[in-house]
Amino acid sequence: FITNSGDVNNVLNTEAGLKRLGVADATGIANYLGLSKEKVEWKTVNGKKYCYVNNQRVTGERQIGGNWYYFDGNGVMQTGFVNLGSKTVYYNSDGQMLYGEQKINNAWYYFDTITGARITGFYNLPGKTVYYGSDGQMRYGEQKINNAWYCFDTITGARVTGFYNLSGKIYYYGTDG
């Protein structure tokens, strides 16, 4: 940023200054949009995957090629569930963070479409309300939640309201559980 009149005269009044300012602006915009020309190199050592950006080993969270990855303190790419502060996220076998509804080890989960945070509790999906337990897994059948009984379809996980045949018995579930 130009903050004083001396910089205005030195930068804006010379061809070299304008060129330098243009490069700085273009670099800032490219970095902001994730379009920078970083040199990215992947290496596998003893079955562990590492990423180097501009010859520096990556640690922590990093967006590479439009996908988010997580590397531990030694730079090892992580997969599976990872606790990141106040949220739990999931990285697939390629190390990429997953979003939205995902089936993992035969269980359904939902991850926030922006942050990737695993969702727990009641959640509205298109056409149905479902419930994800404290472990993030979608619940089915009869469930006691906060001292109230709810029923969730045994196939879709959709919350049931009204009369419902559960194991050969007819039950009524109100809209409040």
Give residue ranges: language-model regions:
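Extracellular adhesion/carbohydrate-binding repeat motifs centered on closely spaced tryptophans
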Residues: 37-177
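Active-site-adjacent mobile loop/cap segments within catalytic or ligand-binding domains
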Residues: 1-37
